[in-house]
């Protein structure tokens, strides 16, 4: 299993986080933790794991194209 962290800058509301966690899950990743202060315009960090480097690349490609 591969673990990774994705930073979501300038989160305005929970819907922003839900959007990116959904992309990760749809691509086969498992969300382990989300760290966000709850403050508008603050960054959030999504910790996730996936099967291998190939899945990690697919997830990152989808996240970066958003």
Tell where the protein language model's regions lie, with residue ranges.
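Short, surface-exposed ligand-recognition loops at beta-strand->loop->(often short) alpha-helix junctions
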Residues: 6-16
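Intrinsic-disorder/low-complexity, polar/charged segments enriched in Ser/Thr/Lys/Arg/Asp/Glu/Gln
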Residues: 1-5, 43-45
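Short, surface-exposed beta-strand/loop "edge" segments at domain boundaries and coil↔beta transitions
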Residues: 14, 53-58
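N-terminal targeting/docking segments
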Residues: 3, 13, 32-35
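Acidic, low-complexity, intrinsically disordered interaction modules
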Residues: 19-55
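A common structural junction motif
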Residues: 26-29, 61-66
